[in-house]
Design a protein with these regions (language model features):
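Extended, regular secondary-structure scaffolds
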Residues: 7-24, 40-221
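Short, charged beta->alpha transition segments
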Residues: 28-41
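Short acidic, glycine/proline-enriched loop segments that cap or flank alpha-helices
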Residues: 38-43, 58, 62, 280, ...
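Generic beta-strand/beta-sheet core signal
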Residues: 82-84, 252-255, 346
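Long, contiguous, structured domain-core segments that constitute the functional module of a protein
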Residues: 154-312
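Short, hydrophobic/π-rich interface segment
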Residues: 308-326, 333-334
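Short, structured protein-protein interaction patches enriched in aromatics and acidic/basic residues
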Residues: 326-348
Length: 348
């Protein structure tokens, strides 16, 4: 069953709260107690599957600090944190400037991004997901676009004035995909790709007269993102929402967490690091962590020997192993996210 809970707290208040418990006392903050102790760490609790913040983050010291604290809570609770990205993270005033830089990676090599790079290299950063740009929340009010029954109102939008439109945090679009995947498959793994869960459909499309006498359409995702730029953004730890030209359709092509995957001499180890930094794989691992803890907590005392519990857990987890991942359908992979699995129970 899908359950959604809301917490009314501003970004500034959240930052101040977590800052008071910074350091060794981070696990005493009311946010940690609400997310971890009252659910994941409580008998009968229902662990959170994902946290979504209607905030925008950049590389400022206070934002890096706040993201780091939320990453700690997410790691302890096995609960990713999804939020929006401010264009100022790339020294821009608007996402409409995204096509201007020749190389995005060079921006993050500047000295002022030292703390940002350190955050990305941390293990906890895999529990952070930053999406961008925003998407159009609704059509402008007007007789021909979005009539208001109570009174005659024409919203002043001409296509060129970007700030006059009503934009929404793309974190909501990702959250909708996560919820849809959970509803259809019971897992939050089908959240990326045009045909595999990453689609964002029926976006508002506003057309307006162009200067040359034709008709133009306002890009419902602020700016069109090329394939090359999308790959650059994913490499730098972002999840761009990419609009399909001349349509009301967009998609999250990838679902890369903020973490920069570690590189090893061993190719297999590097490949594993790449996978662990992607949200679909992380969501599957988090859900298994939730279930295993709850199952073991409930089963304590039901088995006489450690081997009995280990055998029972292995029988349970095999229900989610795809026996033929090379040939199975996307739906089967979404319902059975594992290619192989083994549970080991150790006495301490």
């Amino acid at each position: 069953m899908l359950k959604i809970r809301f917490m009314s707290i501003s970004k500034q208040e959240l930052g101040r709260t977590l800052k008071r418990y910074k350091g060794v006392g981070w696990d005493q903050s009311p946010i940690f107690k609400k997310v971890y102790e009252e659910e994941y760490g409580q008998f009968g609790g229902e662990p959170f599957g994902c946290l979504v913040g209607d905030y925008y983050f950049d590389h400022s010291p206070q934002d890096v600090e706040l993201l780091g604290e939320m990453a700690k809570i997410g790691t302890a609770s096995h609960c990713p944190f999804i939020a929006g990205t401010a264009p100022s993270v790339m020294q821009m005033e608007s996402w409409q400037e995204l096509s201007n830089p020749r190389d995005l990676t060079k921006i993050f090599q500047n000295t002022e991004y030292a703390a940002w790079r350190s955050l990305r290299e941390s293990e906890d950063a895999r529990y952070l997901g930053l999406v961008m740009p925003r998407f159009l929340a609704r059509l402008p009010y007007g007789i021909r676009t979005n009539p208001v029954d109570e009174f005659d109102f024409e919203e002043d939008t001409d296509g060129a004035t970007h700030g006059n439109y009503t934009w929404t945090n793309a974190a909501y679009a990702m959250a909708a995909n996560i919820n849809r995947s959970f509803k259809e498959f019971g897992w939050c793994t089908a959240i990326r790709g045009v045909e595999s869960g990453g689609a964002v459909e029926n976006l508002p499309c506003h057309t307006f007269p162009s200067d040359d006498g034709g008709v133009d359409m306002k890009c419902p995702t602020e700016i069109a993102i090329s394939d090359r730029r999308e790959a650059e953004l994913a490499k730098n730890g972002f999840m761009p929402l990419v609009h399909r030209k001349n349509s009301d359709f967009a998609a999250f092509i990838g679902a890369q967490s903020l973490q920069k995957p570690a590189e090893y001499y061993d190719a297999d180890a590097s490949a594993n690091a790449q996978l662990s930094a992607r949200l679909p794989y992380l969501f599957a691992c988090c859900r298994f962590a939730h279930y295993l803890k709850c199952i073991v907590r409930d089963k304590i005392g039901s088995f006489r020997e450690r081997d009995d519990m280990e055998r029972w857990l292995n029988d349970w987890i095999m229900n989610y192993v795809d026996g033929d991942p090379a040939n199975s359908s996307q739906e089967t992979k979404s319902r059975k996210p594992l290619a192989a699995a083994e549970v080991q129970v150790e006495e301490i």
